[in-house]
Amino acid sequence: MAVAQELYGFPASKLDSFVAQWLQPTREWKEEVLETVQTVEQFLRQENFREDRGPARDVRVLKVLKVGCFGNGTVLRSTTDVELVVFLSCFHSFQEEAKHHQAVLRLIQKRMYYCQELMDLGLSNLSVTNRVPSSLIFTIQTRETWETITVTVVPAYRALGPSCPSSEVYANLIKANGYPGNFSPSFSELQRNFVKHRPTKLKSLLRLVKHWYQQYVRDKCPRANLPPLYALELLTVYAWEAGTREDANFRLDEGLATVMELLQDHELLCIYWTKHYTLQHPVIEACVRRQLRGQRPIILDPADPTNNVAEGYRWDIVAQRANQCLKQDCCYDNRDSPVPSWRVKRAPDIQVTVQEWGHSDLTFWVNPYEPIKKLKEKIQLSQGYLGLQRLSFQEPGGERQLIRSHCTLAYYGIFCDTHICLLDTISPEIQVFVKNPDGRSHAYAIHPLDYVLNLKQQIEDRQGLRCQEQRLEFQGHILEDWFDFKSYGIQDSVTVILSKTTEGAAPFVPS
């Protein structure tokens, strides 16, 4: 019976045996494939790619890296696809790579036809693909069994040094403004190591998920625009990290059931890592926050913050197939009960810092899908507020927004650490936002019948700008000191514009 027919009929308790018997490649087969591919690597390292003119006048191969399943140690027995990333000396920036990528591909393609060692291996089907990024793809055959191997070669700019990448490397990547994933090969070593150094048991789970995906999704829907295997790998790693707290000993059936359940909830997924890039850098922070506000599912490449590897694919088809998998023997125990899954949140918890003028900051761990009401309950228990809690937030470059109790942080697109403003009001007080010239806004509590001067005094106390130097404006009307707010039709959570009335006024005090 074909392997593709056996997973669904295999008992959940024996999935370890299934992986060992059907998915784990033999050492002899793997060595034969890698020995054949080594001929390609030697050609790339030793060939002189000089041209009389153009970007390839002096091209040296700095490094050849095996990536994909052969690189990270999760290859399936049936896999005959090998991916190589070639770092070249002629690329000195992401912009140069984008400009000369096609020319270098054509040069390598032309030189391959003159390599006798590759011709002896049956080099054929040599072409340049239009994928992102574009690459050189061809087939060769192993020396002993003459099994056909498909090799993909991607030239790349070597952006990384021997140590961890600096924030400036990622800032330059973001500023290069390439198509998402176009420069990911420059970070392929980080992508490979993200999986390569994981426990053996996790690699077994990765093989199991990839086998399921290949046999029961891709082969059944060959024309559909399905997610890349890399997205499934990252989702599986996240499930293991969150579900077992990175325990090397776990049950494969529980891991498989967990991944299938996550795939069913693909519209809620928002997953990212900050191992290689930090949100402390403003350019990186803006990029990541923008990505996390996108349409879900979101699975950010841990090595490339510009690349949501889950974007634009038919996840609905994958979800349907995952639902079918959960009904099979591989997801049922010996008592004919569904295998329990791990408790894995669809987005990781984030740190929320609650700030209130005149009080110490409060810090809470909150899940983006929890109702805001729960956060307010935590604040209430922490501080014992008597009034009405008014929470608001402001993204860089955006307007301050009121956060409503029945909503979630996810509703506002908040999926990473954030600061929230707290204002405690007592009825009939209302909240107004005062927007400074620099774009930042602050929340103030006012009584609708208070004079405008009362708000100006609060602004002076907090920001240091004297009342006589302030001009407040609402809907095109300048607010006069001795008029009340009700007379201007000012209601709860509206924004009032603050500006200076005289030259040389004291600067705003950062808050």
Swiss-Prot record:
Per the record, its GO cellular-component terms are: cytoplasm; cytosol; nucleolus; nucleoplasm
Q: Where in the cell is it found?
A: Nucleus, Nucleolus; Cytoplasm
Could you list this entry's UniProt keywords, alphabetically sorted: Antiviral defense, Cytoplasm, Immunity, Innate immunity, Nucleus, Repeat, RNA-binding
The principal location of this protein is nucleus
What does the entry say induces or represses the expression of this protein?
By type I interferon (IFN) and viruses.
Q: Briefly state the protein's biological role.
A: Does not have 2'-5'-OAS activity, but can bind double-stranded RNA. Displays antiviral activity via an alternative antiviral pathway independent of RNase L.
The entry's protein name is 2'-5'-oligoadenylate synthase-like protein 1
